């Protein structure tokens, strides 16, 4: 159970919240006292997961969002803000991550490249843009963009995903410069290879590479990221912005 007081009264929107890291984040934030809206393109699943958390007494709701569709993004943000009656934090966890690797740069599908960039980079920008007016009304707005440590070590045979996450790190810094005057902190969280649905297709040798290369030699679990995410959303990080924090057991050092 997270520290109940850490996010007490905070209103948070989490994308990609139907499963994986986003689902775990939503639960951790709600356990820490936040009111949470879980957003995902998987409409039925995100509703089911929200209902499961509600049965645990947590304050969560669900909305549908398609990061490849600007109208869907605007509608999801408007509905979320209406439900929450404000917005203090946005966690951009949604991404196209499944079955996007396995081919080298020569053989990579240009259409898949465009899809990855459209969702992972443009979609993150558009939903952040839609949330900014509401975050400005918060005493201390926070945005967490979930990237990946693959962009830090240059993972092979995963070019579009790696490039998209590198763009997220760079975009975060630019956003932090622009939004600092509104007291909005923008930071990047870069997980290592984590045991979630989206990584089930990853070959065992890549899992072994991570485990053997980490300072803490074990598999990474979704809950390993919760503490850092809670910190970045809380008032404890009110003077931290533009930073990329790798949480990967020491596979890549900053």
Which residues fall in each region the model found?
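C-terminal helical subdomain
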Residues: 188, 211-236, 240, 249
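Short C-terminal tail/terminal secondary-structure segment
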Residues: 2-3, 97, 102, 153, ...
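Substrate-binding pocket helix/loop in short-chain dehydrogenase/reductase
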Residues: 101-105, 109-114, 199, 206, ...
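Active-site helix of classical SDR
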Residues: 128, 164, 172
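Alpha-helical segment proximal to the catalytic Tyr-Lys
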Residues: 133, 177-181, 238
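Canonical Rossmann dinucleotide-binding motif of NAD(H)/NADP(H)-dependent dehydrogenases/reductases
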Residues: 4-37, 175
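Residue(s) in the substrate-gating loop at a strand-loop-helix junction
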Residues: 148
